[in-house]
Amino acid sequence: MSYSAYSESKVNPMHVVIMGCGRVGSTLANELQALGHSVAVIDQEREAFRRLGSDFNGKTVTGVGFDRDTLIEAGIEKAEAFAAVSNGDNSNILAARVARETYGVQNVVARIYDPRRAEIYQRLGIPTVATVSWTTDQIMRRLTPQGKASEWRDPSGAVQLCEIFVSRDWYGKPITLIEK
């Protein structure tokens, strides 16, 4: 089920700029539009915009997602959110930093493929989604038997949230007693 299916029907509309019109970018654009947001999508290839479908009524801009003129044409100056979801880690981080540092966009996220870079980018203040790590975690969760399958792991791997099944004897007991 999509994110919009879980969202409230009334939202405060915002302008969102998305760099990259692949499967993720086009799906994100359509989901945001369905929630009532105004959306501009940037891609270097004009053909990529076909993925948006005929119902998309947002703005499409052909260009490089960290180029000043391209960003201005996409409405970055009024944007409340920016998502960099192209197929290049470096381009995504550069575009996200430009959106945040040059144009003051507060809600910024960059997709990255190389999970080893995630911690570095987090230190730069750019929230990232490491698709390879996330996908691996989700597949492992479904493949491994009940137990300590990872539900979520932060990009650095320092924090991991796990779902475990506990005995009825543990109900209502403090964790300190269970650990013994």
Q: Can you say where each PLM-predicted feature lies in the sequence?
A:
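Cytosolic regulatory regions of ion transport systems
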Residues: 1-180
